[in-house]
């Protein structure tokens, strides 16, 4: 082996698990700020659960015969104690587990929200990743259609806050367990008569989760699915009253919707109301938010019988939609970039930068990239590229005179060039910058 160092193989990220780089992070922060403001306005409280849970939580909560549990979960055995663990594929079951474990419902209903990464072993494509991010709400302890309506209206408010248009609401009712059981018998009998049309996926689901057969995207099966027995025909008085009550509230609040009798969800815990918010601008991955009522789940996971409803939305899909509709906010950059030349100026630059940060300004202090002092020209190029509103300039002359140079970087004069540098007494710098920023903001509003 030669003395020459062997070139190390360049490592890359896991397929379907994406880095969020600085140029993208601003859009994420914009969305997160907007959605958190909306959630606060409805009185929802943040809950944060672990990324890893016991596998049994999802098997019992989501359903053993669902696609998620059968094919999509990242599960492993803990080498230390042999526990079967899973990286969460969704978060409703985990939030319910936490509510039960910590006795959160002892003093009444709770409005909770979460945000974070989820994991599913899928074929990566646009809008569908192996690590993806969701924000969601869980309204625990609310039984009537008013809670269903409120969580739906929260989504509409978020679309309005983000400026998104054309996201459509689809509704359905899955009724109660005994109603679904009666429909299931009729549905299986009907589908058995059309075995020659069913694809392999439908045949696999026929006796385990026949409702999902109706959600097929296979063109050859559309007629069979369309003519299948309708669950709505099996709904009793209680289920119908709940669904009609929801519709009345939505109509009274001018929330348009379409009833989609083939709308089901890929998780077993839903009953009564289910809904999706869909768009035609993202291709096959058109669902941006989905949810419904899951009254049986809390008891199913070991708690007392408690009504509940909620939704989750895919953040990556919403960000794709913001980009598609050109609603990405501009990065405003920082307020001040401090450049300096000479040892005394460097020491003073640190002091000034911290003083400006104390007032709430965002400040970048030039630091050497190669251990050498860069020229003023080079530093000013960095200042321009940073997007800062002003450059604060410190050199030997400024230190000797007790002044600081301030150069506007965004403003232009009548000739289209940058405005000239001002020399300001060091003790007046903060006041000067704040006044200059206020004036710039007022000019921008004109």
From Swiss-Prot:
One of its GO terms (molecular function) is ATP binding. Keywords: Aminoacyl-tRNA synthetase, ATP-binding, Cytoplasm, Ligase, Nucleotide-binding, Protein biosynthesis. Signal peptide: none annotated. GO terms for biological process: histidyl-tRNA aminoacylation. It comes from the Bacteria. It is found in: Cytoplasm. The keyword Ligase applies. GO terms for cellular component: cytoplasm. It is an enzyme of class 6 (ligase). Its main location: cytoplasm. Its EC number is 6.1.1.21. It catalyses: tRNA(His) + L-histidine + ATP = L-histidyl-tRNA(His) + AMP + diphosphate + H(+). Disulfide bonds: none annotated. Homodimer. PANTHER family: HISTIDINE--TRNA LIGASE, MITOCHONDRIAL-RELATED, HISTIDYL-TRNA SYNTHETASE. Belongs to the class-II aminoacyl-tRNA synthetase family. NCBIfam families: hisS. This is Histidine--tRNA ligase. It comes from Paraburkholderia xenovorans (strain LB400).
């Amino acid at each position: 082996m030669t003395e020459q160092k062997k070139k190390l193989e360049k490592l890359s990220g896991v397929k379907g698990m994406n880095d969020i780089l600085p140029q993208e992070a601003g859009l994420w922060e914009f969305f997160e700020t907007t959605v958190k403001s909306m959630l606060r306005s409805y009185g929802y409280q943040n809950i944060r659960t672990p990324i890893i849970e016991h596998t049994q939580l999802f098997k019992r909560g989501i359903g053993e015969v669902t696609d998620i549990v059968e094919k999509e979960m990242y599960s492993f055995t803990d080498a230390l104690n042999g526990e079967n663990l899973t990286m969460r594929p969704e978060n409703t079951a985990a939030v319910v587990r936490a509510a039960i474990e910590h006795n959160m419902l002892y003093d009444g209903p709770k409005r909770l929200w979460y945000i974070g990464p989820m994991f599913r072993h899928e074929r990566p494509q646009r809008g569908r990743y192996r690590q993806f991010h969701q924000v969601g709400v869980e309204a625990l302890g609310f039984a009537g259609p008013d809670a269903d309506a409120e969580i739906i209206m929260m989504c509409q408010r978020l679309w309005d806050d983000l400026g998104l248009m054309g996201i459509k609401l689809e509704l359905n009712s899955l009724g109660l367990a005994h109603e679904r059981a009666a429909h299931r018998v009729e549905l299986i009998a009907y589908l058995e008569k059309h075995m020659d049309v069913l694809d392999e996926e439908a045949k696999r689901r026929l006796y385990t989760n026949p409702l999902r057969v109706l959600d097929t995207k296979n063109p050859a099966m559309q007629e069979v699915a369309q003519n299948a027995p309708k669950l709505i025909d099996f709904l009793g008085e209680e289920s119908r009253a709940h669904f009609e009550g929801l519709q009345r509230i939505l109509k009274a609040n001018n929330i348009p919707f379409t009833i989609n009798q083939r709308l089901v969800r890929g998780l077993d815990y839903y009953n009564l109301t289910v809904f999706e918010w869909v768009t035609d601008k993202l291709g096959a991955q058109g669902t941006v938010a989905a949810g419904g009522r899951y009254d049986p789940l809390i008891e199913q996971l070991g708690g007392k019988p408690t009504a509940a409803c909620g939704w989750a939305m895919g953040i990556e899909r919403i960000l794709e939609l913001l980009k598609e509709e050109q609603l990405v906010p501009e990065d405003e950059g920082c307020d001040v970039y401090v450049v300096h030349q000479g040892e005394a100026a460097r020491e003073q630059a640190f002091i000034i930068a911290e003083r400006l940060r104390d007032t709430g300004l965002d400040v970048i202090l030039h630091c050497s990239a190669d251990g050498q002092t860069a020229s003023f020209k080079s530093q000013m190029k960095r200042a321009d590229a940073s997007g800062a509103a002003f450059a604060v300039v410190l050199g030997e002359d400024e230190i000797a005179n007790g002044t600081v140079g301030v150069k506007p970087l965004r403003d232009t004069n009548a000739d289209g060039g940058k405005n000239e540098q001002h020399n300001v007494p060091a003790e007046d710098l903060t006041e000067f910058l704040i006044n200059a920023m206020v004036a710039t903001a007022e000019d921008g509003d004109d």
